[in-house]
C-alpha cells in the first residue's frame, strides 16, 4: 500500500512538471522580436585593467523578457578572465533552457561556446583563449530572480610569454573619405607609422558623405599566418570601433565584401612581429539608396554611386554595371598607360623583326638570280656560233646553161653538208653523242673530227689531173667564210680553178674536193673570189 502511494506521488509530480514545462515553452514562443533585442543592458564599467557589468536592476529582480549581450575585448597579446564572485541567482531549469547566462570564446554569437549557467550556484572562473568574450543574458516572461554581477580583468596571453616584456604598440590611425578610396596596409610603412619589424594595430576611419552608406570590396588579401587570428587579422566595424559594432573579422585565406549600414566604417589590422608580411587592399565606395539623383549612377543592386565613378577602371558596384560598356575607353586608357620605356622597346623590337623579314626575302630572291647571272657570264657565244648560226652558202648565177648538171652536183653536195651540220649541232658536248675525243674548242672540233674520220676510212687514191673540156661554159663560185682548223691542210691554190666536165667525178674525188673547199672557206672571212674555169 505504501509503495502504491509513493508511485502515485511520483507520477503526479511528473505530470505537474510536464505541464509547467509546456507553459514555459508556450510563454517562450510568445516573446516578440521587439523584446529580444541583442543590445547591451544593465550597468557597465570599463577601464584599462578590467571592468564590471551586471544584469538589469541588480541586486533587485531582473525584468522579464529581456536579452542582453556583453562583448569584452582585450588589448593585443592579452586574454580575459571572468569572475562571478557576487551574489548570484537565476531561475533554475533543465539544461538552463529558460533564464540563463551564455558565454562564448570569441566576439560573435557563433563563436565556440564555453558554457551556459543558471540556478543558485555561482559559475566557475572563465578564461578566454584570445582577446574576446561574448556574454548573453536571457530572461523569459516568468519567474524572475536577482540576477548576477560579473567582474573581468586582462592577463598576458600565454602564447606570447616567450617574447618577454613587449614594447607598447605605436599609434597608428588614418582618416579617409569621399565618393571612393583605397585602404591598404602599405600605408603603414609609407607614412612611417611603424617599422617593418614592429607589431601593428592600425585603424582606418572612413566617413561617407551625408545620407550615404559604405560598400567595401577587397582587391588584395593575404594573411601570413592563416587561421591564426591571435597573430594577424583584418576586422571591419560598422558605426564605431567598439567591439559591439564589429561587423566582420578575417584571418583565414578568404575575405568577402562587406556592406555597411552606416556612413562610418572602421578597418582594423592586427599583425604581430612574425606576421608583418600580412597585407590587404580594400576599395571603399560611398553610395545612396534609390531613388537615384541626377548626378548618380544606378547600379541595379539598390546602389546609387557618383557619376565620376563610371568607367574609371574600378568596379564600384556590387556587380560590374559601371564598367560594362567602357570597352573603347579601356583601350584608350591602356595605350595611355604605356610608359616611354615600354613603348621604345616595342618599337625597336618591331623594327628589328621587319628588317630581318625584308633581308630574308631579298636573300631568297637574289640567290637563284645570282646563279643564273653567273652561268650567263660564263657563256661564250662564239663557241656556239656554229650551232645557233650555221653558215650559209649561196651559189652564183650560171653564165650558161651547159653546166646545169655539174652545178646540180655541187648544190647537192652543199645541201648534204648543211643537213650534216644541223644534225651535228644538236650535240653541244662530246659525251652527248658518244664521242671519245676531247674537244678543245667546244662544238667546232666535233665537225672536224667527223670529217677527219670519214677521210681516214677512205683509202687514198692518186688524184688524176683534169683536162679542161672544150666548149664548156664557166661558172661563178661564191665562197663564204667558216672557221675550221682542219682546212689548214689544204692549199687554196689547188682548188682555185675547178674545171667542170661533162663526166662525173668519182665519189672519192668529190669528197676530197668538198673537204678542201670547206677548209678554204674558213681561212678567208667574208671574202668573195671569182674564179674562172
From Swiss-Prot:
Disruption phenotype: Depressed long-term potentiation (LTP) at Schaffer collateral-CA1 synapses, NMDAR-dependent spatial learning and memory. Rescued by the ampakine CX546 at physiological doses. The chain crosses the membrane at residues 345-365. Pfam families: CUB (PF00431), Ldl_recept_a (PF00057). It is found in: Membrane; Postsynaptic density membrane. The keyword Glycoprotein applies. Keywords: Cell membrane, Disulfide bond, Glycoprotein, Membrane, Phosphoprotein, Postsynaptic cell membrane, Receptor, Repeat, Signal, Synapse, Transmembrane, Transmembrane helix. GO terms for cellular component: axon cytoplasm; excitatory synapse; glutamatergic synapse; postsynaptic density; postsynaptic density membrane; Schaffer collateral - CA1 synapse; synapse. The keyword Signal applies. Disulfide bonds join 41-68, 96-118, 172-202, 229-251, 292-304, 299-317, 311-326. It is a single-pass type I membrane protein. The modification Phosphotyrosine is found at residue 417. Glycans are attached at residues 306, 340. Gene3D superfamilies: 2.40.128.620, Spermadhesin, CUB domain. GO terms for biological process: anterograde axonal transport of neurotransmitter receptor complex; memory; neurotransmitter receptor localization to postsynaptic specialization membrane; positive regulation of excitatory postsynaptic potential; receptor localization to synapse; regulation of long-term neuronal synaptic plasticity; visual learning. Expressed only in brain. Present throughout the central nervous system. Highly expressed in the hippocampal CA3 region, olfactory bulb and tubercle, caudate putamen, and neocortex in the adult brain. A motif (PDZ-binding) lies at residues 531-533. GO terms for molecular function: ionotropic glutamate receptor binding. Residues 41-155, 172-287 form the CUB domain. Residues 1-22 form the signal peptide. Residues 366-533 are cytoplasmic. Residues 291-327 form the LDL-receptor class A domain. Residues 23-344 are extracellular. PANTHER family: NEUROPILIN AND TOLLOID-LIKE PROTEIN 1, OVOCHYMASE-RELATED. Interacts with PLZ domains of DLG2, DLG3 and DLG4 via its C-terminal TRV domain. Interacts with GRIN2A and GRIN2B via its CUB domains. Involved in the development and/or maintenance of neuronal circuitry. Accessory subunit of the neuronal N-methyl-D-aspartate receptor (NMDAR) critical for maintaining the abundance of GRIN2A-containing NMDARs in the postsynaptic density. Regulates long-term NMDA receptor-dependent synaptic plasticity and cognition, at least in the context of spatial learning and memory. This is Neuropilin and tolloid-like protein 1. It comes from Mus musculus (Mouse).
